[in-house]
Design a protein with these regions (language model features):
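Conserved NAD(P)H cofactor-binding loop of Rossmann-fold oxidoreductase domains
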Residues: 86-91
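C-terminal helical subdomain
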Residues: 178, 194-236
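Conserved glycine-rich cofactor-binding loop
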Residues: 11-12
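Active-site helix of classical SDR
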Residues: 118, 154
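Substrate-binding pocket helix/loop in short-chain dehydrogenase/reductase
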Residues: 94-96, 102-107
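Conserved glycine-rich Rossmann-like NAD(P)H-binding loop of the short-chain dehydrogenase/reductase
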Residues: 25-42
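Residue(s) in the substrate-gating loop at a strand-loop-helix junction
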Residues: 138
């Protein structure tokens, strides 16, 4: 049986490049996004270019009924070997300048839909005793700006969720990778989705979607659990992660810290 990869947010940017690269590796594809015309064009192009079977699945992952369609596919198709949880969006503005609906929409796509799809995919992976889950987070998972409180919060969830799954599935043939891109040349900037134009960013700080995905897949091949496509010194992450563990260990004390002087 041929292996199938499901890619969300596949109509452009990082998702479209994942679709291309996975097709080149011989995967059949299910391409998930809101824009049906773009999906159909991409699917046809990949079918011709690589001789694989790519099919579009039009779904808005901010809509519960559409998420359920993708969940059903993930639980019913035994050929599915990989899920790339790429769909997401961010509005970079202060909470005071954001509508509640907009903030909740980010949470619905970046957290709720991602979790539902991961849950559905992992059910199938466990039954088949193998699979690959790739969750796309962001460098803002570990850094907040005055304009990124909601977006950073959603991506911090993706990182923590993925790390927990990695521990949960450590002794299985199911791989979980979390990818944390920095600024990447995608429609989140060029189509005004973020609220900040691409021209406002220093060009040397912006990575192409192609380089981002190629680095992420190289990290997957190398067995990385956490991939930072733009970070040259991997020791920085190792130090960060070790410090996180040390801080957690320091919380496991049943008494207030001496600096609070509660004994006086």
């Amino acid at each position: 049986m041929s292996k199938t990869a499901v890619v969300t947010g596949a109509s452009s940017g990082i998702g479209a490049i994942y679709a291309d690269r996975l097709a080149a590796r011989g995967y059949d594809l299910v391409l998930v996004a809101r824009r049906g015309e773009r999906l159909a064009t991409l699917a046809e192009s990949l079918n011709k270019k690589y001789g694989i079977k790519a099919q579009p699945l039009v779904a808005d992952l901010g809509n519960d009924a559409d998420v359920a369609k993708v969940e059903k596919l993930l639980t019913s198709d035994p050929s599915i070997h990989m899920l790339v949880n790429n769909a997401g969006f961010g509005r970079l503005r202060s909470l005071a300048d954001s509508s509640l609906d907009d903030s909740l929409s980010q949470i619905a796509v970046n957290i709720t839909a991602l979790t539902k799809l991961a849950h559905a995919a992992l059910d199938g992976f466990r039954a088949r005793k193998e699979g690959v889950l790739i969750n796309i987070a962001s460098v803002l998972a570990v850094h907040s700006l005055p304009i990124s409180s909601v977006y950073s919060g959603t991506k911090a969830y993706v990182l923590a969720f993925s790390r927990g799954l990695q521990d949960e599935l450590a002794n299985t043939n199911i791989k979980v990778q979390v990818v944390l891109p920095g600024s990447t040349d995608t429609e989140i900037w060029t189509e005004g989705i973020s609220g900040i134009p691409l021209s406002a960013l220093s060009p040397e700080r912006v990575m192409t979607a192609e380089n981002c995905v190629d680095a992420a897949l190289a990290g997957l091949d190398a067995g990385e659990l956490v991939t930072w496509p733009s970070v040259a010194d991997d020791g920085l992450w190792q130090t960060f992660d070790k410090t996180r563990q040390t801080l957690f260990d320091a919380t496991q004390v049943g008494a207030p810290a001496p600096r609070y002087e509660l004994s006086k």
